[in-house]
Every structure is written in C-alpha cells, then in structure tokens.
C-alpha cells in the first residue's frame, strides 16, 4: 500500500519491543505487522529493537539441556503426521474492496456480520474465542462506536477512511493505541466511514446498556 501522507500515529515503543522479542500476542502481531507494512519510521525503530534483542540473547549464559531432551526430540520424529489444516479463506478471496495487509496472509477471515447500527465486523478465525481477539471493523460514515473500556491494550490500524478518537484523527496507515482502562467512544469519519484491523487483549466493557446488550449477542 502506497500512502500519500505521512503517518502520524504509531504503536508505542513497548509494543514494538514486544513485537521484536516475539512476546507480543498473535492478534496484536497481526495489527503491528499491518502497520509496519506502511510505516518506514516504525520499521526503522523495530530494527533498533531487534538489534538490542540480539545483543541481549548473546549476553545470556548458555543453559544446559535436560537429560531426556534428545529422547523427546526423537519421539516427536516418530509421532504420526498431524492432519492437514482445513482450507482457509485468504485475503485475496475476501470481498473487502480494499487491499488487505500482508500480515493477514494465511489467516482465516470471516464474513462481515452486523454488529450494531452502521457497524459490521469480520472475525479473524482462531482469534475470537481466546483472550486475544482480532477482527476487521467496518463503520459507515459518521457512526459512533459504543462507549467502552477494556482490560488490555487495544490497537486499531486504519485501512480505509478515517477515525476520530479522544479528539485525535486517525487516517489510513495510522495505528490508534488505547491503553487498558481508557474509556473511549471513537467515531468514524462523517464522509468516508472507516475500515480498521483491531486487536484487543481481554474483554471490552461497554458503558451503556445498548452496548452491553450488543455484547451479549456478539460476544465481543
Ligand atoms: Zn509507525
């Protein structure tokens, strides 16, 4: 994806460091990966973190292997082949109308489902019934997401349109990061709406009864 404007909102250093060291959960990795595809600045910062991580690994004292390590490895070689994975939808087959991030390649992507007035979501398979959730969100122009807070960090990468949250405007290529406990109520651009790739760690907590009602039905 080629952008014609500078990216002004990025994941913070803690998120990028976790990405570099492999400790960031898969849902958030997919969103950060999407951001890195469009953001040279974050790719550069990530390179610095990866270099630091490499130095830290080299500085660690070697750890002795368990006495049965070889036997356990050999046992896995004798184990039967796991069944082939079920066929999955690919981003190329997903009728989104926009270019999907390469970070979603190979991920199963569900169909758009009505979630709330003017809002549809598409779940990333395998990342819905877990603590970490990843999904695409499509909001019609001028739609307000129900007021909510959440247990963990929420990341939203803008793929189309624009989003306004906490008086900040996020456009294509931007990554909106909301910290745990932040109560917020983003709304989509009044002219274009928006499509975002979102990762949430933990539960969201709608502040209003309408949001709680919706949550009962869609388990977000
Ligand atoms: Zn960035």
Predicted regions and their residues:
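Short beta-strand His + acidic residue motifs that chelate non-heme Fe in jelly-roll/DSBH
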Residues: 46, 145-147, 166, 184-190
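Positively biased amphipathic helices and basic secretion/translocation or surface-docking motifs
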Residues: 1-14, 26-27, 37-40, 51-108
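Sequence/structural segment immediately N-terminal to covalent heme-attachment motifs in c-type
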Residues: 32-36
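Ligand-binding loop in jelly-roll beta-barrel domains
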Residues: 182-206
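Short acidic-glycine-tyrosine-enriched beta hairpin
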Residues: 165-185
């Amino acid at each position: 994806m080629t952008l014609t404007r500078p990216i002004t909102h990025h994941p913070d250093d803690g998120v990028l460091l976790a990405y570099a060291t492999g400790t960031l959960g898969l849902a958030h990795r997919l969103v950060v990966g999407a951001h890195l595809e469009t953001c040279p600045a974050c790719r550069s910062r990530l390179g610095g973190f990866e270099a630091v991580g490499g130095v830290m690994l080299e500085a660690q004292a070697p750890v002795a292997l368990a006495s049965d390590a070889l036997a356990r490895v050999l046992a896995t070689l004798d184990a039967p082949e796991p069944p082939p994975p079920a066929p999955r939808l690919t981003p190329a087959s997903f009728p989104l109308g926009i270019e999907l991030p390469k970070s979603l390649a190979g991920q199963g992507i569900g169909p758009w489902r009505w979630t709330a007035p003017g809002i549809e979501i598409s779940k990333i398979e395998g990342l819905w019934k877990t603590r970490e959730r990843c999904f695409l969100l499509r909001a019609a122009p001028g739609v307000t997401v129900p007021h909510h807070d959440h247990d963990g960090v929420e990341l939203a990468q803008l793929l189309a349109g624009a989003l306004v949250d906490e008086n900040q405007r996020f456009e294509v290529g931007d990554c909106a990061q909301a910290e745990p406990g932040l109560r917020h109520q983003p709304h989509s651009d009044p002219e274009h709406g928006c499509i975002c790739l979102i990762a949430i760690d933990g539960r969201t907590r709608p502040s209003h009864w309408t949001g709680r009602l919706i949550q009962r039905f869609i388990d977000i």
